[in-house]
C-alpha cells in the first residue's frame, strides 16, 4: 500500500486573494464607492456574525476553491446538491448581503467594484458580477434541512433557537455576488497573531518545519478537558504504517453562543496542552479559522473537511454530535455522512469517495469517559464497565468553573484551567456573554493599517 501524502487543496489550487503591494492596492481602489461592513445582530443588539471573517477565510484560501460571494445559480446548486458550479463539493452558502436601503444608497450595479471598509479603513474589494434577491428564511431552511426532506439525519425542524439557522434567516435580502480581494492586509492582535497559519503558511510549516507526512485535524470550539486530549491522542493512532506524525488543532474563532468559552481562552488552553508536555509540541500545533459557526453537524463537518484539507491535513477526527447544538440532528449524523453518505443532501457515498470530493480521510471516534474500575480515561468501545462510567460533561465542568471550583486533574489539566482564569480576569466573567460579544464585535481580532482612498 502506498504511503499517504499531503492531499492537494480542495479544487486543485489554493485561493490567495490578498494584495501585498500598497501601490497596486491603491490603484485598485481609486474612486471606488465605499461600504462600511456591519455585523449581523439579534433584535437585542447581540452580534452573531461579521462578514469580514468570511472574507478573510475566502481570501486566504481556507474555503478554496470559493473566491467570493456566490452568484444565484451557484447558491441554488449548493442548496440542492452541496456543489459549486465547478462541480467541487461545498456545504454552505457564502453570501455578501445588504439591505434594500443600503443597496439603493450605494447605487452600484454589475461590473462595479465596491470598496469594503472595516473599522473606518479600506479592507477589501468586491467585484460585482451579479445582484439578486433571496428569501432568507428559505435559504436558512434549505441550508440545514428538514425532517421531511432529510429523514436520514434531521430529527427536529430548525427554529430560532439554532444559531446557524438564525444567521441565515437574518441575512439581508439583496445579494451582491462576486470575487473578494483583500487590499489592506490586517494585523492580528495578541494572542491571535501567534496562532494565525493560513493554508499556504500552514502547509509550509507542516512540510518544512514540522516535517509531518500525515496530520490529523482536531476541530474545536472549546477549552480542552482531558477527554478532548485523549480523543486527540487516540485518534492520532490512525495513519498508515505508523501513527499520524502531527495533530493540528484548528479552533473556530468568531461569534459564539452565550456560555461558550472566550476565544482567547480556547486558543491558549489548547496551547497549554503542548506547552506543558501533555502532547509533545513536536507533534501538536494550534491554529484557527475565522468563521461565525453555524452548528450544522454533518453540513459543518464538510466545511471542516474543506478547511483542514486546504491546510494540509491528511486525516480528520469526527466524534458524536460534531459541531452540533440541540437535538436537531441525529447525534451520529456526521459519522453517517463520512461512513455511508446522506443521499438527501446530495451524497450517495461519503464525501471522500465521490467525484470532485474531498481527499481528507475521516476517523470516526466514539466517546471517552473516566472509568473508576479501570482507573483511567477509557475509550467507550474498549471499556466494559459501562455502568460505572463517569462521562465528561461540558455543562457540569462549566458549573464548576462558574463556582470557582478547581476541576480535578482527571477532568482538566491545571495549566489549561489557568488559561480560563486568566481571561476570566480580563473580561470579569469566565464565559461568553453579551458584553463579551459586543466588545469583540467592536474591537475584532485584527487591526488595519491606515490607508488613504485615492480619488479617481
From Swiss-Prot:
User: Which InterPro entries does this chain map to?
Assistant: ATP-Sase_PUA-like_dom, PUA-like_sf, Rossmann-like_a/b/a_fold, SO4_adenylyltransferase_pro, Sulfurylase_cat_dom, Sulphate_adenylyltransferase
The catalysed reaction is: sulfate + ATP + H(+) = adenosine 5'-phosphosulfate + diphosphate
Question: Which GO BP annotation is one of this protein's?
Answer: hydrogen sulfide biosynthetic process
Q: What is its EC number?
A: 2.7.7.4
Q: Name one Pfam family in it.
A: ATP-sulfurylase
> What does the record give as its pathway?
Sulfur metabolism; hydrogen sulfide biosynthesis; sulfite from sulfate: step 1/3
UniProt keyword terms in alphabetical order: ATP-binding, Nucleotide-binding, Nucleotidyltransferase, Transferase
**PANTHER family for this protein:** PTHR43509, SULFATE ADENYLYLTRANSFERASE (PTHR43509:SF1)
User: Can you tell me which family this protein belongs to?
Assistant: Belongs to the sulfate adenylyltransferase family.
The name under which this protein is listed is Sulfate adenylyltransferase
Organism annotation: Archaeoglobus fulgidus (strain ATCC 49558 / DSM 4304 / JCM 9628 / NBRC 100126 / VC-16)
Classification lineage: Archaea, Methanobacteriati, Methanobacteriota, Archaeoglobi, Archaeoglobales
